[in-house]
């Protein structure tokens, strides 16, 4: 998922949406499922696919996603994301309000996620992994998707289509990856080889631009959010299906899945333990503090021992003020009068609600499109 924090990462949306003419008769260069596109949306999606497919890296990601059965469509305009890969729906969605130039890298990024999900379907989900394994996996997935996106955009630039790379370089989400990528490419005399792709991957973890902020934002999503959900579940008296955080994923196994390409693994010659370095595995002080509180609460409620993988993870200073209350277990409401008191909703909670509503609206939109097409086939 790209640009999930609309307020923090809004620079990706600054470019005005172009209004080009799309060929209604054009067919996609890669045979993909466009069943969740309306007749009006289809020409634009075909144009985006065909533009990305002119790059070797872009075409590869599209072919893998298509082979895995992913559909391609546009998100509801209320979505806060530039693009999203819905593993559960087997769908890649793009935000229609974002410019075509920016959507090229987004399409590559989300298609790469589709391939990752397909290759890693036998690996435990992030919510089941211990904290250290979850951090490695989530960050590596984003770093790999961004690395592929910048390579695809560079390949297009080499053919004269410069706008996608410019849009990528100017987006806050792309700054770290792009800076390291261009430096490595120059050192390799302009040859786009595995070393450049690996360096672009590592660039996602750099301290360029807002990358340190991005890391902590993701920690709130893939570490703290499921923990908060579990605490809420405990407070409701339910301990069934609690997040266990006990499955392990080694750096070696992760790299074997993440670094795959049609020509081999671009990380094959790299010691996988680099993912355990402080820059790669470190988490914010607040993340560790809240996680420790969660494990204490969980032990009290369920008897499950703490996930000790978090103890060895180094920490860095928080990059922005606290947006959530401190992790805590709240006692059940004592009486009806207290129940009647309206809860104060934080700005972050309001933003999360908007994003959730946008995703629900997207699912409703796609279901409506599929239903209408089904009825049309039936002649109704």
Can you describe what each PLM-predicted range is?
Residues 1-7, 11, 145, 327-380:
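Non-Sec secretion/translocation targeting segments of pathogen effectors
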Residues 92-107:
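Short pre-active-site segment immediately N-terminal to the catalytic Zn-binding motif
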């Amino acid at each position: 998922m790209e640009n999930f924090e609309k307020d923090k990462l809004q620079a990706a949306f600054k470019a005005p949406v172009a209004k080009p003419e799309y060929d209604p008769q054009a067919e996609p260069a890669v045979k993909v499922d466009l069943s969740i596109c309306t007749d009006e949306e289809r020409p634009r999606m075909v144009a985006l696919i065909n533009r990305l497919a002119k790059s070797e890296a872009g075409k590869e990601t599209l072919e893998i996603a298509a082979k895995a059965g992913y559909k391609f469509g546009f998100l509801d305009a209320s979505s806060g994301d530039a693009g999203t890969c819905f593993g559960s729906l087997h769908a890649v969605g793009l935000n229609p309000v974002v410019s075509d130039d920016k959507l090229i890298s987004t399409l590559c990024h989300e298609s790469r996620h589709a391939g990752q999900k397909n290759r890693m379907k036998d690996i435990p989900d992030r919510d089941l992994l211990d904290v250290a394994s979850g951090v490695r996996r989530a960050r590596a997935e984003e770093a790999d998707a961004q690395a592929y996106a910048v390579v695809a955009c560079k390949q297009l630039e080499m053919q004269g289509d410069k706008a996608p790379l410019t849009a990528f370089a100017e987006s806050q989400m792309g700054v770290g990856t792009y800076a390291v990528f261009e430096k490595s490419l120059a050192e390799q005399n302009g040859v786009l080889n595995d070393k450049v792709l690996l360096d672009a991957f590592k660039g996602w973890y750099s301290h360029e631009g807002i990358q340190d902020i991005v890391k902590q934002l993701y920690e709130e999503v893939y570490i703290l959010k499921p923990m908060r959900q579990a605490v809420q579940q405990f407070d409701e008296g339910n301990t069934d299906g609690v997040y266990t955080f006990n499955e392990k994923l080694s750096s070696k196994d992760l790299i074997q899945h993440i670094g795959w390409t049609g020509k081999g693994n671009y990380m094959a010659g790299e010691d996988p333990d680099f993912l355990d370095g402080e820059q790669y595995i470190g988490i914010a002080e607040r993340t560790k503090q809240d996680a420790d509180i969660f494990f204490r609460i969980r032990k009290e409620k369920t008897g499950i021992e703490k996930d000790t993988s978090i103890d060895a993870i180094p920490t860095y200073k928080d990059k922005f003020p606290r947006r959530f209350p401190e992790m805590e277990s709240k006692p059940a409401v004592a009486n009806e009068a207290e129940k009647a008191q309206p809860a104060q909703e934080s700005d972050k909670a309001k933003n999360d609600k908007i994003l959730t509503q946008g995703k629900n609206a997207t699912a409703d939109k796609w279901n409506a499109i599929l239903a209408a097409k089904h009825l049309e086939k039936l002649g109704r």
